[in-house]
Amino acid sequence: HLSMNTNGGAQDVEWWKELAIIMGRKGHVTFSFDGLGDTNHLYRQGVNWENCMKNSAAFISKGGRARWEFIIFDHNQHQIEEARELAKKMRFDDFRTKKTGRFFSTVKHEGKESHQGMNRKGQETQKLEKPKDEYINNALKQEKNLVNKYGSMDHYYDVTDINCKSIEKSEIFVTAEGHVFPCCWLGGQQYKWYWKPKEAPIWNMIKDPNNINAIYNELKDIIEGNFFNMIENSWS
């Protein structure tokens, strides 16, 4: 089964129609639409809403299986049901809301009330505010209890058991460059705006990106290779 996540703003309708035919019913595309025409661009910087609608409709028109995934913020929480109805009208197979973990600082390892968006140049863009409590990620609600029990989040990370979702579901993540990772969370560590190129800690494990590139290697060799083993060994 092949799945692809996209903001839906790139390419033209003919490209999306062709993709639907190529994927058939054995795969699906998750369109990350976080709001409607007046709000989606606040998080999806530079994405044109009309293109999103045309491209997703074109994909569905040729039998493509489409899922609408909606990340909830303060600025779009009032649009959830309207977006759900639009997804039904457009014949999306599924509509899912996502309670984001973005209101947790991965630098300070603590919760925060807002999240300052940045572009690739490190410039501030949209400031994202937390939604209502019912839309807060459940894991974020456990922070205070975990700190009280373990003393700090760092100590909790050191002693907690890790249940790898990718192992449980037999999944892998392939970047647009062809790099193979267990999941998108690790793949996304390559290019954080606050790290200079190839200075993020994940590069200490990657070393030569060609070694984990599916263009040059068999998937089996990558999955059974040093990079995946190093990740698993780091848990103990």
Locate predicted features.
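Immediate flanking context of iron-sulfur cluster ligation sites
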Residues: 226-236
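Radical SAM enzyme [4Fe-4S]-AdoMet core and its adjacent flexible, acidic
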Residues: 18-217, 221, 229-230
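Active-site metal-binding loops of divalent metal-dependent hydrolases
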Residues: 8-9, 35
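Conserved Radical SAM active-site core
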Residues: 1-3, 9-25
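Short His-Asn-centered micro-motif
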Residues: 6-7, 168
